[in-house]
């Protein structure tokens, strides 16, 4: 039974879903903005909030956990350098999701997720 699932299934097995979210997280932190479906954006929001929370913590253990999740090691180091000054006064809400026009091919609800 699927009671109280925290992450949407996204129509994929668990390993593919994790790889998708890792890739989107890496891209969002690198670019600052990603266009994807609304459901993926909502799932991505939790992962990005977790990574920025680790970066604000700044400990060695948090850095190692982030390196294990984000694909680019240099990106992790730059995130840890900038996160405290950029998000130091925030307790959460590091991302913004803006709905856009539906995708042309299959009419899927699209959204832009960006770092605040």
From Swiss-Prot:
Keywords: Ribonucleoprotein, Ribosomal protein. GO terms for biological process: translation. Pfam families: Ribosomal_L17 (PF01196). One of its GO terms (molecular function) is structural constituent of ribosome. Transmembrane segments: none annotated. GO terms for cellular component: cytosolic large ribosomal subunit. HAMAP family: Ribosomal_bL17. Belongs to the bacterial ribosomal protein bL17 family. Part of the 50S ribosomal subunit. Contacts protein L32. This is Large ribosomal subunit protein bL17. The lineage of its organism: Bacteria, Bacillati, Cyanobacteriota, Cyanophyceae, Synechococcales.
């Amino acid at each position: 039974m699927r009671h109280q699932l925290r992450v949407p299934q996204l129509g994929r097995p668990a390993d593919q879903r994790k790889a998708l979210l890792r890739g989107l997280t890496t891209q969002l932190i690198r670019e600052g903005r990603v266009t994807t479906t609304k459901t993926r954006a909502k799932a991505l929001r939790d992962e990005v909030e977790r990574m920025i929370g680790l970066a604000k913590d700044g400990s060695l253990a948090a850095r190692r956990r982030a390196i294990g999740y984000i694909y680019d090691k240099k990106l992790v180091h730059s995130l840890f350098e900038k996160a405290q000054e950029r998000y130091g006064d925030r307790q959460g809400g590091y991302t913004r999701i803006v709905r856009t026009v539906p995708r042309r091919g299959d009419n899927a609800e699209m959204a832009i997720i960006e770092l605040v």
